Regions:
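A short macromolecule-binding patch
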Residues: 60-68
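Short aromatic-glycine-enriched beta-strand elements
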Residues: 48-56
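Short nucleic-acid-contacting surface segments enriched for D/E, G, S/T with interspersed K/R
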Residues: 74-89
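N-terminal export leaders
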Residues: 6-8
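Short boundary/loop segments of OB/S1/cold-shock single-stranded nucleic-acid-binding domains
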Residues: 21-34
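Structural detector for short beta-strands of small beta-barrel domains
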Residues: 33-49
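OB-fold/S1-family single-stranded nucleic acid-binding modules
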Residues: 95-119
Length: 122
């Protein structure tokens, strides 16, 4: 006979895990207003689950989450464009915790060209 508590616990866990994954990969950790940052790439780690740029802006190092490889490619953004020394502007959403210098990019602007990673976000 199955233990009701074990079944209920399993069901609760199964329902909770997808929301935890969405929270990490979603936008809930970020502010709702658009934030803009201009700086120079110090380093880049591109790939899944998403790329990470370290950007120096006004004397502070920021961590910028860019898209997954398919999202960057769809926007026309190539890995060769996201290398150390490139100056860029990022528009997106910064962390709600203002002590953290972290943001998620919705748009990347290089040499005046806009690469929209999330065209559905204004």
């Amino acid at each position: 006979m199955y233990d009701r508590r074990a079944i209920l616990s399993g069901l609760v866990l199964a329902l909770a895990l997808p929301s935890a994954a969405r929270a990490h990969h979603g936008w809930t950790w970020a502010e709702g207003e658009t934030f803009e940052l201009t700086g120079v790439i110090q380093s880049a780690r591109l790939g899944n689950p998403h790329g990470i740029l370290k950007v120096m802006a006004k004397g502070e190092e920021w961590t910028v989450e860019v898209g997954q490889p398919w999202r960057n490619e769809r926007a026309g953004l190539k890995d060769s464009m996201l290398v150390k020394g490139v100056e860029l502007t990022i528009q997106g959403n910064r962390a709600k915790d203002r002590k953290l210098k972290v943001m998620k990019a919705a748009r990347v602007i290089i040499k005046g060209k806009v690469y929209s990673l999330y065209p559905e976000r204004s």
